[in-house]
C-alpha cells in the first residue's frame, strides 16, 4: 500500500510506501532518548559531564560495531523484517530499563545495549529502500525516507519540550523518566506497525553497488544530534572483507587529506556538543524545556534544508561549500566561548540559541557535501569502500571526542571545550579551502572536476 503526499520543496505529488511510516514512532522515541539523555544522566542519576561523555562514547562504539554486524548478517541471510523487529524490541526494552535506572552504571549498560540493537534498524531500512525500488528511483526514495525521518525527530523533541513545560519543577526527575518510558512505548508502536506493514521483499540484494546518483542525497544523517549519538548512518552498501586491502592500494593524497579534515571536524563537534546541554542548564540557567526548544530549532532547520541543500550541492563545489560552512562554525563556537567566560546576562541564552541555529544550517551543507566529496575523490570503482571507511572514521572520532569533551568540561570548564572546538574548526576550514584549490588534475576523476 502506498500513500500520495505532496513534497513541500517541489510541490509535486509523491507516492510513499506505507512502511516508511513504520519508523515515525521509533524516530519520535529516538529523539526523546538522544536529547534527554545528557539531562537525565546529570539531573536524575546524579552523573557528571564526564559520565555524559562516557555514555556517548560507549553508544557510538556499540553503534560502529553493531552496524557492520547487523548489515552483513541481514544481507547474508537475505532477511529484513526480523532485524527490524529485533531493533525495535531492543530499543524499547533498553530505553524502558534506562528510564528506571538508579545509577550511572546501569544507564551505561542499558544505553550501550540499546545502541547495539538500534544499529540493526539503520542498515536494514536502507536495504529495504533498495530492495523495494528500481535503481533509477533510489535517490528519490532515500530522499523521501530521510525527510520523514528528520521531521519525525523534530516532532519527538517538540513532544518532549511540551511535556516538560507543563510539569512542575519539583517533578523534573519524574518527568524525564516518564518521557523515556514514552520513547519506549513509541518504539513498541513501531514494532506493531512493522509486524503489520513490513513484508519481506521479493528480491534481496546481497551485494550493494555504488550508484553516482545517490552521492548528492545520502548524508551522514539529517539530524546532527543523531549522528553524534551513534555512528551507524544510512548507508546503501555493506563493506566486504577485502575493503581494507583495496583501500590501501588506492588511497589518493586528496582523499587522505579529506579524511584527516573529517576526523578533526567530528572530534571537535563532539568536544563542543557533548557537554553543551549541561552548559545551558548549569551555566546559563536554562530550563529543560528551553534546552529542548533550542535543540528542536536546530533540528527543524536541518530537516527543512536537507533536500534544498542536496540540490544546491549538485551545482556547487562540495569542498568550498563545506569549507565555508565549517568557517561559520568557528564564529559560532567563539560566541559560545565568549558567553562561557563572561558573566551571565539575560541575553546570554538567546544569543547562544540563535548561534546554535546557524550550526543547523551548516550541518545541512556539511552532511550532504561530505558524501559527494568522498565519492569524487575516491578512485574509480572504490567509491563504496571510500565512503565505508569515512563512516568508520566518523565513529572513531566520535568515540574519542565524546570522552575528551566530557573530561575537558569537568577539568577546565566549558570555555575550554568551545575554544578548542573553534581552533580545530579553524584548522579544518583552512585545510578544506586548500584542498579545494588543489590542481584540477588531482581533483579530477575521468575528466570530471569535483562538484
Residue ranges and their predicted role:
Residues 2-60, 64, 254-295:
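Helix-loop boundary and gating motifs at the non-cytosolic
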Residues 120-133, 365-378:
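Intracellular juxtamembrane helix-capping segments at the cytosolic ends
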Amino acid at each position: 500500500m502506498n500513500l500520495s503526499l505532496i513534497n513541500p520543496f517541489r510541490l509535486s505529488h509523491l507516492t510513499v510506501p506505507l512502511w516508511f511510516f513504520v519508523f515515525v514512532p521509533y524516530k519520535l522515541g529516538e529523539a526523546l532518548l538522544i536529547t534527554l539523555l545528557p539531562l537525565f544522566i546529570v539531573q536524575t542519576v546524579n552523573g557528571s559531564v564526564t559520565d555524559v561523555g562516557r555514555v556517548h562514547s560507549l553508544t557510538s562504539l556499540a553503534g560502529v560495531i553493531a552496524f557492520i554486524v547487523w548489515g552483513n548478517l541481514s544481507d547474508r541471510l537475505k532477511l529484513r523484517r526480523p532485524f527490524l523487529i529485533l531493533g525495535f524490541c531492543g530499543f524499547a526494552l533498553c530505553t524502558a530499563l534506562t528510564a528506571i535506572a538508579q545509577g550511572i552504571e546501569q544507564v551505561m549498560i542499558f544505553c550501550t545495549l540499546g545502541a547495539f540493537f538500534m544499529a540493526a534498524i539503520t542498515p536494514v531500512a536502507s536495504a529495504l529502500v533498495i530492495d523495494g525500488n528500481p535503481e533509477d528511483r533510489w535517490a528519490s526514495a532515500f530522499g523521501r525516507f530521510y525527510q520523514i525521518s528528520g521531521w519525525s525527530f523534530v516532532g519527538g523533541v517538540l513532544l518532549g519540550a511540551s511535556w516538560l513545560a507543563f510539569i512542575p519543577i519539583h517533578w523534573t526527575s519524574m518527568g524525564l523518566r516518564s518521557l523515556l518510558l514514552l520513547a519506549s512505548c513509541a518504539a513498541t508502536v513501531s514494532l506493531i506497525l512493522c509486524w503489520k506493514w513490513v513484508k519481506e521483499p521479493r528480491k534481496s540484494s546481497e551485494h550493494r553497488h555504488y550508484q553516482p546518483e545517490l552521492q548528492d542525497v545520502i548524508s551522514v544523517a539529517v539530524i546532527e544530534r543523531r549522528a553524534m549519538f551513534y555512528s551507524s548512518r544510512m548507508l546503501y552498501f555493506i563493506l566486504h572483507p577485502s575493503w581494507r586491502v583495496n583501500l590501501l592500494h588506492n588511497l589518493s593524497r586528496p582523499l587522505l587529506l579529506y579524511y584527516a579534515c573529517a576526523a578533526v571536524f567530528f572530534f571537535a563537534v563532539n568536544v563542543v556538543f557533548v557537554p553543551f546541554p549541561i552548559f545551558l542548564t548549569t551555566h546559563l540557567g536554562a530550563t529543560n524545556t528551553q534546552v529542548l526548544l533550542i535543540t528542536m530549532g536546530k533540528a527543524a532547520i536541518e530537516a527543512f534544508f536537507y533536500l534544498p541543500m542536496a540540490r544546491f550541492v549538485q551545482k556547487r563545489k562540495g569542498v568550498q561549500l563545506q569549507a565555508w560552512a565549517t568557517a561559520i562554525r568557528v564564529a559560532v563556537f567563539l560566541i559560545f566561548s565568549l558567553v562561557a567566560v563572561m558573566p551571565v546576562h539575560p541575553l546570554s541564552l538567546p544569543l547562544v540559541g540563535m548561534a546554535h541555529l546557524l550550526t543547523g544550517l551548516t550541518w545541512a551543507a556539511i552532511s550532504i557535501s561530505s558524501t559527494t566529496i568522498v565519492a569524487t575523490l575516491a578512485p574509480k570503482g572504490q567509491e563504496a569502500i571510500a565512503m565505508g571507511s569515512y563512516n568508520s572514521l566518523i565513529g572513531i572520532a566520535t568515540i574519542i571526542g565524546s570522552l575528551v569533551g566530557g573530561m575537558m568540561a569537568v577539568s577546565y570548564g566549558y570555555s575550554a571545550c568551545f575554544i578548542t572546538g573553534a581552533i580545530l574548526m579553524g584548522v579544518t576550514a583552512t585545510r578544506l579551502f586548500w584542498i579545494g584549490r588543489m590542481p584540477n588534475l588531482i581533483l579530477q576523476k575521468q575528466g570530471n572536476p569535483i562538484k
